[in-house]
Amino acid sequence: MKIAVCIKQVVTRDWPLRVDDTEHWVRDVDAGFEMNEPDAYALEEALRLKEQSGGEVIACSAGPTRVLQVLREALARGADRAIHLESDSLAAADSLTLAQALAAALRPEEPDLILTGLQSDDQGFGQTGVVMAELLGISHSTIIMEVRLDLNGKGEIRVKRELEGGWFQWVTMATPALLTIQSGINQLRYATLKGIMAAKKKEILKVAIDSSVESTQAISRIYVPEKEKKTRFIEGTPSQAAEELVRVLRDEARVV
């Protein structure tokens, strides 16, 4: 089975947020970067499926040269090869633009299964995987908690979806298919020294992206949430103050 995993590089979660001068994105010049956590679970699930059925795992990521960091990490964890969509503009691209680029890169590979994280830690749209499946003309399923391979030779998979209110749904799907993986589906593995050394010899295919491609989505402004503190003194007798406090909590704060 050929499995492709789409991985995004995001700013580390402990990095203090700074907005750039344009107020259209964060100032990431001096930031640290890491693999998007939901994508790390997607990669781990792909590696486990490969261990069950054989085949290969292809890691794919879009962005500037620094994206090679997460691709090498994926190779060190066990991916067989990688595809780098080299473009400075794709790092903060909207879901449609990114999905179009990823779909174009993966279409020639004809993977049996494409895995993505449920959403990215930076933008959190949760749309890229679904849009990519539509562009490729393949079935998809979201918020996956478990994947079972078909051992009867029918080319099907059975997946467990997380629904609202603690409910789950089992779905049988034909391949090729795309799945968006929920965080916590498995236990992440760490790259071993042997894996790190082996990753240096694995192929990373660079795919040039048209620099004139523009996002269809325009970000008006990014800003740090403004915190406002207001102090109100409630006067009157204890019973009057208590009655007024309950009214404020119920009608204004809406917490009771």
Regions from the language model: what does each represent?
Residues 1-256:
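N-terminal glycine-rich FAD/FM-binding segment characteristic of electron-transfer flavoproteins
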